[in-house]
Regions:
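Hydrophobic helix-and-loop "lid/oligomerization" segment in the mid-to-C-terminal part
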Residues: 1-97, 102-137
Length: 137
């Protein structure tokens, strides 16, 4: 039952996951990672937003990662943002700042702008929390 619910994926879901992982980029000294799937890629693979479930979690479980960001394009310069963290970053605070919500370790929001601008805006908030944690250590 667990395999069917959590692990079983279609071939195209596996393809888009592979692409997201392959094109992911680490930043903030390798403590954070992001990946983006564009609408054209979703169309190419014949997937919809439900097929993207779990990608952000696959990014989060990479060794050394504290915070993962996954974006998928919903329109021109419009992105659905999924945020996950392991132990330090409160992603609900970041999502709330941008009009979204969620929990301490899993949150999301919708943002406008280029991928570069969206990731820069999010990374500034992540960096702030990582700096605070460093100062308190």
């Amino acid at each position: 039952i667990i395999d069917g619910s959590f692990y079983k994926k279609t071939y195209m879901q596996s393809q888009i996951l592979g692409r997201a992982l392959l094109e992911s980029i680490t930043f903030l000294d390798g403590r954070c990672i992001f990946s983006v799937v564009r609408k054209k890629d979703m169309d190419f693979y014949g997937v919809d937003k439900s097929d993207l479930d779990g990608i952000v979690d696959q990014l989060r479980v990479i060794d050394g990662i504290e915070c993962a960001i996954f974006l998928y394009e919903t329109g021109i310069h419009q992105f659905k943002v999924s945020l996950r963290s392991n132990s330090i970053v409160d992603v609900s605070r970041i999502a709330a700042y941008f009009g979204g919500g969620g929990h301490v370790r899993a949150a999301g929001c919708t943002m406008s702008g280029s991928v570069h601008d969206v990731v820069n805006n999010l990374s500034a908030h992540i960096a702030e929390q990582l700096e605070q944690e460093k100062a308190n250590a």
